[in-house]
Structures are given as C-alpha cells and as structure tokens.
C-alpha cells in the first residue's frame, strides 16, 4: 500500500495518473487497473485526463475509472430504477409524517458519494449511522443533534425506511457498498487499484477497501487529512491517517499562493487530533 499525500494543488491526481502510466508501460491491461475516486467529479476528471493523454483509449475501455459506488453498481448488475431517489425519501417522509426542521418542504438528497443531505435531522441520523455502520441509537447518543429529536420517532422511521425499500425493491448508496462486501465473489480482480480523495471515505467504504485489498496486488491511496470535509457526514479520516502504508509527500502547490498556505497552516496547527506528518 502506498499513500500519496499533499495539500491542495500539489498534484495528487497527476501523480496517481503517472503511476497508472507506469503500470501500462509494464504491459498491464487497462481493464486490470481500477481508478476509484470519492466524487463523481474527480472520477470524471481522471478519465478525461487519461483520454487526453492516451487518445488510443475510448471511454468504454476506462470502465474502472469511476466512483466506488459506480463500481458497486455495475459489479452487482444493478439498474437505475433500483436506486433510492430524492422523491422516494420525500414520499417516505410524508408517509411517516416527518417534517423538515424548519417546517418547510422536506428536502433530501443522497449524493453519489453516499452521504445524505437533508433539512430533517431524522434522515441525517439514519444515514450517518448507516455509513458509520453503527446502530442508530449509538449515533443518536453522540449528542450532535437537536434536543427536539425524538428517539422513538427516529426508530419508527428507520423501520419504515427498511420496509419502504423492501416493498419497492430499492437500495441506497450505502446498501450498494454493503451488498458488494457481502457478494465480494462477484468482484473482478486487478493488478493495481488507485483510490483518490481517500480522506473522505466513510467506515463502510473502508470496509470495502479491506475487500479490495484482497482483489489486487498493489493499491495506492491519495488524499490530505487537512482536506477531510465530510467528517460531519461520517467520514473516517482517522482510518486514513492510521492506515499503514509507504508515504509519499508532495510539497509544492501550483494552486495555492504561498501567503494563503502560510495562513492556513496557522489555523490547521490549532486543530486537535492525529495528523499525518512528514
């Protein structure tokens, strides 16, 4: 395992793609290389850069340049109509008599990275417990939520959500990860896997990472613990920091001016908790 580390603009994605090239030069087929990004935007960027650099490849040949959820989706043979959409969550909210925190229209969006945003804390708690793979009572007891949150209503909604998905044969993004882990024998194998933006992976995605370790000879992680912006939604930056690996540090940023970086370093130095140090 190798970790490519560095602040914004130091070329982490560029470095990963350079490593991709080194494997291609060894004669490794492109379909034996998995390049997974945390966000759809990052996956698309990597694919575009590869095609620009290697015009001999068509988009269809870069089928494993995608998000982790897209990889699960295609590996498991799922279809779009199998996946929970915002209107499904809103329908469930109406059926369960769940209102938004501000009494406006209930809005729920599940991003392609598996994190859910909602103006109802009830849905937020359920999703966060799911991506952290812990009981909802444990998440409820973190005291990170409003005192108005009623545990019995929360538990009732959790049951309703499970029944709703079962009745309508639907799964959410976290279900995809769990299904992949359970049905790992369906997974293709690789010579090398790259995971970009790894600091934002959730505990359930790290469980998927542990499975991927058994499906490949080499694996590269890229990220920056100082850029972990999804801890509020359940990201496990501690696992990223503590994952044993050979560390490669990138220091020169071409995106962030020196004065901005210096000010940022002052702020970052005040943040408590474990950090990756050179």
State each model region's role.
Residues 18-25, 48-52, 178-185, 207-214:
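Short, well-ordered alpha-helices that flank and scaffold nucleotide-derived cofactor binding pockets
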Residues 7-18, 38-41, 199-278:
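Conserved helicase motor core of SF1/SF2 NTP-dependent helicases
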Residues 71-118, 122:
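A basic- and aromatic-enriched beta-loop-alpha substructure that forms the phosphate/nucleotide-
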Residues 1-6, 14-15, 32, 103-194, ...:
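Accessory N-terminal region flanking or inserted into the helicase ATPase core
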Residues 35, 194, 221:
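Conserved SAM-binding loop
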Residues 1-82:
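P-loop NTPase Walker
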């Amino acid at each position: 395992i190798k970790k490519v580390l560095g602040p914004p603009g130091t070329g982490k994605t560029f470095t990963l793609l350079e490593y991709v090239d080194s494997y291609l030069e060894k004669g490794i087929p492109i379909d034996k290389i998995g390049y997974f990004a945390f966000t759809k935007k990052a996956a698309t960027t990597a694919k575009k850069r590869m095609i620009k650099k290697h015009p001999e490849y068509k988009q269809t040949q870069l089928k494993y340049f995608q998000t982790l959820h897209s990889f699960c989706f295609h590996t498991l043979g799922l279809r779009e109509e199998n996946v929970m959409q915002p209107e499904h969550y809103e329908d469930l909210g109406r059926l369960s008599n769940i209102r938004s925190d501000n009494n406006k229209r209930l809005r729920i969006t599940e991003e392609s990275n598996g994190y859910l945003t909602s103006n109802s804390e009830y849905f937020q708690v359920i999703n966060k417990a799911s991506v952290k793979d812990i009981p909802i009572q444990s998440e409820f007891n973190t005291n990170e939520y409003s005192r108005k949150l009623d545990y019995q209503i929360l538990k009732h909604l959790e049951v309703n959500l499970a029944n709703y998905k079962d009745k309508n044969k639907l799964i959410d993004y976290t279900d995809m990860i769990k299904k992949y882990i359970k049905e790992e024998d369906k997974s293709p194998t690789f010579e090398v896997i790259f995971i970009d933006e790894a600091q934002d992976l959730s505990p359930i995605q790290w469980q998927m990472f542990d499975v991927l370790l058994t499906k490949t000879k080499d694996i590269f992680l890229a990220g920056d613990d100082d850029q972990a912006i999804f801890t509020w939604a359940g990201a496990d930056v501690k696992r990223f920091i503590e994952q044993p690996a050979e560390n490669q540090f990138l220091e020169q940023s071409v995106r962030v001016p020196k004065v901005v970086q210096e000010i940022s370093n002052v702020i970052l130095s005040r943040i408590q908790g474990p950090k990756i140090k050179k």
